[in-house]
């Protein structure tokens, strides 16, 4: 039964369809980017970072995480967050999805695929998102910004006194050590939920916008581009004119997975989830999967840029984005 204030007109149905196609297309871009990073080498034969990694490393995974937040927002009311029993039902559904993701992720972790399985991390991320499902963008955007700025600092402080991660995938047997499992999922692992909370909050905030409107898509495109460029530029200034690179070269990377790599290559490939703890200057990098404030803000910006571009393309060239949307609609999250 439709109330007079929510009549489904042809225009609103078309707007909703465009929105969903654009979101699915952006998810397709993320999936292709993640597959490209897994398939192609990080370093080219000449010793430089490969083009695939320069473009997609870190950015595609961040896009996927932001879109997970967008999906949760759309499932819980879109621009109008649900209230009362409807909100409670959305929260319960999200917890159920989190459980499924966690169980499937633990089972997949038993296979020696050579890939970092993200599903268990996503399960915990969805649990983290539950208390925020009733909020609107005016609160969610500042919360996402605070998470991006503060959680890397908290992570850097915590990890100075924590054991190094296993760099293995969580498996069912990991449940026998719940404290160790939680610390790796939340702080030290490949996709640490502490810092990745910025992505899910940013996605929730974006999903609360009127994504079917052209001005929203344009705002995401332009705002994302500005955020990505600005954070990259500030990081460059800190690392170069301000002397950050020299400090990092002197401090070294300790037992981090990037140890032994030339610094310029390490900064453009992958940090495997966290920064080294040998210097606080590591928080100034914008390196893929470093979880620094600049990495989080830069990749949130690129995610918004891609989503805005796909939403606009869905308006003017719907057939062109259908292949990407078809790919994106098949993802598990």
Task: Mark where each language-model region is.
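Alpha-helical transmembrane segments and their immediate juxtamembrane cytosolic regions
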Residues: 1-333
């Amino acid at each position: 039964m439709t109330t007079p204030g929510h009549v489904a007109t042809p225009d609103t149905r078309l707007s909703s369809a465009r929105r969903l196609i654009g979101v699915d297309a952006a998810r397709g871009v993320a999936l292709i980017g993640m597959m490209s990073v897994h398939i192609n080498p990080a370093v080219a034969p000449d010793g430089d970072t490969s083009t695939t990694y320069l473009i997609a490393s870190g950015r595609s995974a961040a896009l996927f995480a932001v879109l997970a937040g967008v999906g949760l927002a759309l499932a819980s009311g879109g621009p109008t967050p649900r209230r009362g029993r409807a909100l409670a039902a959305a929260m319960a559904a999200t917890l159920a999805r989190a459980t499924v993701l966690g169980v499937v992720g633990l089972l997949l972790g038993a296979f020696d695929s050579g890939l970092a399985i993200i599903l268990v991390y996503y399960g915990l991320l969805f649990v983290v998102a539950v208390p925020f499902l009733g909020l609107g963008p005016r609160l969610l955007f500042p919360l996402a910004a605070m998470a991006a700025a503060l959680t890397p600092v908290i992570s850097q402080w915590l990890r100075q006194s924590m054991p190094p991660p296993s760099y293995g995938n969580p498996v069912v047997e990991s449940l026998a050590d719940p404290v160790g499992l939680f610390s790796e999922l939340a702080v030290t692992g490949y996709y640490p939920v502490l810092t990745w909370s910025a992505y899910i909050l940013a996605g929730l905030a974006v999903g609360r916008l009127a994504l079917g409107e052209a001005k929203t898509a344009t705002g995401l495109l332009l705002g994302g581009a500005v955020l990505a460029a600005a954070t990259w530029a500030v990081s460059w200034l800190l690392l170069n004119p301000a002397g950050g690179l020299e400090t990092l070269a002197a401090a070294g990377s300790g037992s981090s997975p990037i140890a032994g790599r030339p610094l310029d290559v390490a900064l453009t490939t992958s940090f495997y989830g966290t920064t080294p703890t040998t210097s606080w200057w590591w928080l100034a990098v914008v390196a893929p999967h470093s979880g620094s404030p600049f990495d989080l803000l830069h990749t949130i910006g690129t995610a918004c840029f891609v989503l805005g571009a796909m939403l606009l393309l869905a308006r003017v060239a719907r057939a062109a984005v259908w292949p990407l949307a078809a790919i994106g609609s098949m993802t598990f999250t």
